[in-house]
C-alpha cells in the first residue's frame, strides 16, 4: 500500500492445430547508455579521477539498443553453436557428470559478476561486498575458467593488480569499486593500501599458473620486478626462524 509497483508482460496470440507444436522465442535485452565523463568540468565526486572509463565494451560496436538486438537476433544461431563448441569436449569426455556440470557452470563468473568496460579493462565482483570489486583472493577460485578460455581478459585484471602494487611490495585486496570506479594501468585504484597477506602470494601463484598454461615467458618476465618486490614483502612478514609469513587473511 502506498507504493508504486512497476512490471511488464509479453503476450502473443496464436492458433494451434490438434497435436501441433510451435516454439515462440522472446529476446530480453537492456542497454546501458554510455556514461561520458567531462574531466574538466564535472565535479570530482562524479567519478574516480585516476580510474578507467564507465562504459561497457559493447559501446565500441553498438550505439543503440536497436543495433544490439538486431545483432543478437541475426547471429543467434552462430552464438549458440559457438557456445556449445567449447562445451562439447567436456560433455563428450569420460569425466563424471557432476564434474562436467561443475566445469561448464564455472562460466557463471563471466555473465553474472564481470565488468568489462569500453577500454577493455576487466574486473570481477566477489559478491555484495558493498561494491568492492577485483578481489585478489576471490580470483584464486574464480579465475581458472576465464584464464583458460579468455586469457587476455584474465591478464587485464592481473595487470591492473600489478600496476597497483603498493610501496611495501604488497598487492592490494581490491582494484575497483562499483560506486566509485575501477583502476586502470597507469592510473590509481580507489582502494589503495587495503591488503591481506594472501593477496600478494595469490597474485604470484596466478602469474606462475599463466606461464604454466601458456608458456608465455615474455609476459612472465614483464612482471619479474613486481614478483621480486612481492616476495620481499612476504619475507618481511616472516618471524625470525619461521619461513611462513604471518598476518591477517
Where are these regions (language model features)?
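Aromatic-rich carbohydrate-recognition surfaces in CAZymes
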Residues: 47, 54-75, 131-245
Amino acid at each position: 500500500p502506498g507504493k508504486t509497483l512497476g512490471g511488464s508482460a509479453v503476450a502473443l496470440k496464436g492458433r494451434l492445430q490438434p497435436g501441433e507444436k510451435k516454439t515462440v522465442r522472446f529476446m530480453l535485452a537492456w542497454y546501458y547508455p554510455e556514461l561520458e565523463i567531462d574531466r574538466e568540468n564535472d565535479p570530482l565526486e562524479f567519478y574516480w579521477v585516476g580510474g578507467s572509463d564507465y562504459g561497457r565494451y559493447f559501446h565500441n560496436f553498438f550505439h543503440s539498443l536497436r543495433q544490439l538486438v538486431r545483432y543478437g537476433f541475426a547471429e543467434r544461431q552462430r552464438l549458440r553453436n559457438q557456445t556449445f563448441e567449447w562445451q562439447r569436449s567436456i560433455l563428450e569426455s569420460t569425466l563424471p557428470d557432476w564434474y562436467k556440470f561443475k566445469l561448464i557452470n564455472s562460466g557463471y563468473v563471466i555473465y553474472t559478476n564481470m565488468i568489462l568496460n569500453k577500454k577493455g579493462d576487466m574486473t570481477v565482483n566477489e559478491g555484495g561486498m558493498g561494491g568492492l570489486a577485483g578481489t585478489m583472493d576471490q580470483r584464486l577460485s574464480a579465475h581458472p575458467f576465464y584464464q583458460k578460455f579468455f586469457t587476455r581478459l584474465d591478464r587485464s585484471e592481473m595487470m591492473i593488480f600489478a600496476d597497483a602494487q603498493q610501496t611495501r611490495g604488497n598487492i592490494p585486496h581490491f582494484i575497483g569499486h562499483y560506486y566509485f570506479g575501477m583502476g586502470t594501468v597507469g592510473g590509481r585504484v580507489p582502494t589503495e593500501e587495503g591488503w591481506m597477506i594472501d593477496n600478494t602470494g595469490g597474485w604470484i601463484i596466478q602469474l606462475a599458473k599463466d606461464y604454466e598454461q601458456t608458456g608465455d615467458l615474455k609476459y612472465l618476465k614483464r612482471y619479474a620486478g613486481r614478483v621480486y618486490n612481492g616476495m620481499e614483502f612476504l619475507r618481511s612478514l616472516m618471524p625470525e626462524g619461521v619461513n611462513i609469513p604471518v598476518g591477517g587473511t
